[in-house]
Swiss-Prot record:
The species this protein was found in: Vibrio cholerae serotype O1 (strain ATCC 39315 / El Tor Inaba N16961)
Enzyme Commission number: 3.1.2.-
NCBIfam families registered for this protein in UniProt: unchar_dom_1
Family (UniProt): Belongs to the thioesterase PaaI family.
UniProt cross-references to PANTHER family, sorted A to Z: 1,4-DIHYDROXY-2-NAPHTHOYL-COA THIOESTERASE 1 (PTHR43240:SF5)
UniProt-recorded name of the protein: Putative esterase VC_A0580
InterPro entries given in the database record: HotDog_dom_sf (IPR029069), PAAI_dom (IPR003736), Thioestr_dom (IPR006683)
């Protein structure tokens, strides 16, 4: 059974990236299943840290992007989600190639959600494991919609 409470597709997801950090890092959504979202990000000069390896912050951007977007599509039209906490363990260095992140829910509650995001290299080896906690907020009448819904 699908966890999505709003229309979701790769076309919709990739359209939300326009003029954002997501677009700047060339993060591309690649798969939506009944309970997960995946995206890729290149490991290259604009995602490197000074030693020429994948910057941990870039991995966290990918993780938070996947978890936040997934959370926002899992709530109804009367709600939206905002990040409360994120952690990441960087377990493998990368110098070039493509990483793929996949977000799956660990908990979808009324007021909070917890998402696990695994980031792997092209050989399927774990590069980073992250956990994102979000708050579920209720929209008020006439309240501006989050960017992902505009």
């Amino acid at each position: 059974m699908s966890i999505w409470n709003k229309p979701i597709s790769l076309e919709i997801l990739n359209a939300t990236s326009k003029n954002t950090l997501i677009e700047h890092l060339n993060i591309i959504y690649t798969e939506v299943t009944e309970n997960s979202i995946s995206a890729t990000m290149p490991v290259c000069h604009f995602t490197h840290q000074p030693l020429g390896m994948l910057h941990g912050g870039a991995s966290v951007v990918l993780a938070e992007t996947l978890g936040s977007v997934a959370a926002n599509f899992s709530v109804g039209e009367d709600a939206y989600c905002v990040g409360l906490d994120i952690n990441a363990n960087h377990v493998r260095a990368m110098r070039e190639g493509l990483v793929t992140g996949t977000a799956v829910p660990l908990h979808i509650g009324v007021s909070t959600q917890v998402w696990q995001i695994e980031i792997k290299d092209e050989q399927g080896r774990l590069v980073c494991i992250s956990r994102l906690t979000v708050a579920v907020k209720r929209s008020r009448p006439n309240q501006a919609k989050p960017v992902a819904e505009v």
